[in-house]
Structures are given as structure tokens and as C-alpha cells.
Amino acid sequence: MNLDLNQLVKWHREFHRFPEIGWSEFWTTSRIADYLEDLDCFEIFLGKQIINPDFVRGRKQAVVDKGLANAKAYGANEKWLEKMEGYTGCVALFDSGKPGKTIALRFDIDCVNVTETRSPEHIPNKEGFASINDGFMHACGHDSHITIGLGVALWIAQNKDKLTGKVKIVFQPAEEGVRGAAAIAQSGIIDDADYFASSHISFCANTGTVIANPRNFLSTTKIDIRYKGKPAHAGAAPHLGRNALLAAAHTVTQLHGIARHGKGMTRINVGVLKAGEGRNVIPSSAELQLEVRGENKAINEYMTEQVMQIAKGISISFNVAYETEIVGEAVDMNNDVELIKLIEEISLEQPQINNVNSDYAFNASEDATILGRRVQEHGGKAIYFILGADRTAGHHEAEFDFDENQLLTGVNIYTSLVQKLLS
């Protein structure tokens, strides 16, 4: 197998065709494991070997069951499905057998809930690799991340005798909704890493640009609040009911009234409110889906605590039961200077790169930061960077596609990083 653009495009289009949402990436994980096994130099870890179930966020059993059934129907390797034990994602360990550093590289693998455009001008339609899973699409470029990760693995297999130390390639499930990284971090699988690197393709940068030091990663918590009241006839006996919808409505106004923190940026958004059973019934159930963000972990924790206090207070005020669930999370992270300089240096060595930006305000959240911070807290160094690529539409849009030539650029940046740290 040759490590060239043709091979990378082939992989990318294969994974683009079969997108799977978070915690249901059974076919994707199985296929990744197939390719890794063929390289014959990696130990492959799956399931509870890399996932701590106590820290799994936003995993719905119905989605898991459907994903597993679809993977089996599409021919996923039963050997890997059994080893997953219901949890997706994998880690590939290369051990050179020689003393040296350990590097962890993270690539996310899930898709988004978007129906891919049927426009004949859309390249995946022209070339026959559009999504076959209706309602799901790799509209954020994670199929490219999988491809780059496999490209790095192939390069390692071809250069294994020249390397020292260890490389751990993390194929992470459920990045969308920032749901997957915490469970991997809490498994301890990367606690021994001296270096951690991850990236995103395109996003805010076009072909020819690398953002070596995006800053202002926001800590975030995704929270669901559910209220349970009591139904009653809205005309004849409203006094017998306990109104969950009214409780939820008051919650929304109070949440948006949380005092902003004086030491940094805060954000809150209630994105979904669902309630009620009928126009003549006192609503007995309500659910809110919301997120808070903070400039750092402490500020985000302040926002989260305020949300929990409001939910509790409203439940008492309206005499309704309540429950809260954290369904996603990410933290802030500062890139380490040593790795920023390395990514700058490596990027400028690539003929396709003509611009390296080392000061970009990200002002969003990414759960790779949980893994990066985990490595930093254990004495290692971490970086998250942006690999520019021209795109046909914004991320999470039905028309999204990107410049496939940048797949090879991505592989070259990562392999150069490995080479400089482990040769």
C-alpha cells in the first residue's frame, strides 16, 4: 500500500459514504481496526480498554442499538464488534521497543445529523461517494480526520525501524456535542503521553494556511433538565395539576438572568424546550436542552452551578420533580510553546502552506482539550491546530465539501511531528 494522495482520497471517500453519529460509530471503528491490523505493527485497544463508562456523556441506547445493527448489516467485522462491548472508538499503540518519548495523536470519527445535498454539482454526488445513511453526513470533516490518522499509521508502519518511543493514535467517538473525550481521558489510556496533538481541517482557514496556535478555547457544559409534574383537566380541575411547562418557562428566563462573571467571558443558551401533551391538559412533562460556556474551567463551573441551583429552586417553587443530566463537556486549554514552534516550523516546510497564523481567537469549544489538558496535568505538552482547506460550504451544512489535496498535507504535518520528536 502506497502512502500517497490516491490512497488517502480512497479512504476519505469510503468513510464519507458511511457516516455514523456519536456512540454509534461501529462500522467506522471496525473498518479503522481492519486497516490497522493489516499494518501489523499496532496493538489495537477497543471498548472498555479505552472508555470509562462512568464518564460517557450523551449516549442513548436506542442510537447505539441502531448503529450496531446497521454496522452488522453493512458487513462490519464481528471480531471487532464483540471486542467493543457496545462502546465505539479505538486506540492504536505503536511501540518501537526502544527508549523514547510517547506521543498521543487524536482524530475524531463521528458525523452530524445533516442530510447531504442531492445537487448534481456536489462532488460526492458526482463521484459516487455521497452518504448512504439518510439524515447523516460527514459535514464537519471528521472523515478527513480518520483518513489523516490512518495515513499517519501507514507512515509509521513504513518507517518503524527509524523511530524510538511510542505513538498512540486515538480515534475518538462522539466529538459532536463534546461527548466522547472525557470517557477516554478517564480511562487513563494516554496518561503516559509526553506529547499530545490534535487538529481540525478547514474550519476557519483556507488552503495554504495553518493556524498553529488557536487560543481562547471555551470551557463548556451541555445540560439537559427534565421536569415531571402532574396532568389534570385544564378546564375542570387545573388546581389538581402541577405544570411542568410553566416551570420550564420560568427556568428559561432565570437561566438567561444569571449574573455574568467578573473575571472572564460567559455564555448561556437554551436551545430546546419541549413540553406538554395537549391544549386542554395541564402539562406534566418538560425538557430543556442548554449549554453554558466560560473563558476557563472555573468560570464554566460557576455557570454550571448556577444552572443546577435554578433547576432545584424552580422544582420547589412549582412542586414538580426534576432531574439534570450532563450530556457533554469540554475545557479550556493553552497550547504549549514548544509544540507551537514545531508546528510553525513543520508547516512552513510544506510546499502547500504559504501562511502560518499563530494568533487566532477560537472562541468556541472542542473536547480534544480534555485530552490535551489530561496530558498536561500529567507533565506532558499539548497542542491543537487548524489545517486550512478550501470548502464549498460551511461546516454542518448539506453542501459541505473540502479540498482533498489537504489530506496529504495533514499527514505530512503529523508525520513530521512524530519524526522530529521520536527519531
Curated annotation (Swiss-Prot):
* GO biological process per UniProt: folic acid catabolic process
What cofactors does this protein use? Answer: Mn(2+)
Give the matching CDD domains. M20_Acy1_IAAspH
Q: Name one GO molecular function term.
A: dipeptidase activity
Q: Where are the annotated coiled coils located? A: none
Q: What does this protein do?
A: Catalyzes the cleavage of p-aminobenzoyl-glutamate (PABA-GLU) to form p-aminobenzoate (PABA) and glutamate.
What's the miscellaneous note?
Unlike E.coli, AbgB is not present in H.influenza and therefore the multicomponent hydrolase AbgAB does not exist in this form.
For this protein, what is the EC number?
3.5.1.-
Its signal peptide is none
Gene3D superfamilies in the record, alphabetically? Answer: Zn peptidases
Matches recorded under InterPro entries: AbgA (IPR033845), Amidohydrolase (IPR017439), Bact_exopeptidase_dim_dom (IPR036264), Peptidase_M20 (IPR002933), Peptidase_M20/M20A_hydrolases (IPR052030), Peptidase_M20_dimer (IPR011650)
From the Swiss-Prot or TrEMBL record, give the protein name.
p-aminobenzoyl-glutamate hydrolase subunit A homolog
Starting at the broadest rank, the lineage of the source organism is: Bacteria, Pseudomonadati, Pseudomonadota, Gammaproteobacteria, Pasteurellales
One GO cellular component from the entry?
cytoplasm
Q: Which family does it belong to?
A: Belongs to the peptidase M20 family.
Q: Which keywords does the record carry? A: Hydrolase
